[in-house]
């Protein structure tokens, strides 16, 4: 697919101010990568250190359905991509802090890896890579990384057990920590595109990068589409409601724990009082 060429008035180049819905909105993230295969190819090339000519095909295996509800738990967050018919890449945009993200990401990766059909050989299993774009530190805030990669290794020798089961994280809060290799692959450019809040930022990023320019145009056109905006708004509302409910559950749990502590303290006091009464009665009886 060729780069989208901006046209006169319908171009991000003429847009100014705040971006209504950026690519950290998981619906916007999905819809742009689904509609613009050129952008999807560019993103995959950056993440996997591929040259564009090395990517023959990138195909989304779980496209969004037009009538699919986006404001419930059944909405599929991850994007399953078949690369060159030889590897499966799972992409996820996750801005809200998830206490169980490590377990959930492993679950996603296992589902992608478990692709063997009946009658096929285990050797036919394609490499599976889950890549999460996060707004939080999933492992440790003491040693923050921008782009981290995890795989199965021998704990003593560090020899890889398999290169077919890989989990990676792009920490959108740690763009400044990007390594020289990350910058050479323009992964920091993609991260800045995803987190951009104004069209002015977008224009600066797109100046010398055709993939970013194409993504910027798709972002502009998607924001101009009423149905897409409604879907993005529905996702934001749902996530906000989900976060509010989670906070309320946390507060209730804290209150219950506090009441339980107070009840335990009162019970201890009652025991002490009863013990003192018994001792006093024994003293009085002795006298």
What are these regions (language model features)?
Residues 1-166:
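Accessory alpha/beta interaction modules
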Residues 2-17, 89-94, 192-287:
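Short, charged alpha-helical interaction segments and adjacent helix-coil junctions
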Residues 20-23, 167-171, 193-197:
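Short acidic (Asp/Glu) and glycine-rich catalytic loops that position anionic groups and cofactors
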Residues 25-32, 172-176, 201-202:
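Short hinge/gating elements
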Residues 116-121, 138, 157-158, 176-179, ...:
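Short helix-to-loop capping/linker segments positioned immediately adjacent to catalytic or ligand/cofactor-binding
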Residues 142-144, 179-183, 231:
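Short conserved micro-motifs at the rims of enzyme active sites and ligand-binding pockets
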Residues 165, 171-173, 186:
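Intrinsically disordered, low-complexity linker/assembly segments
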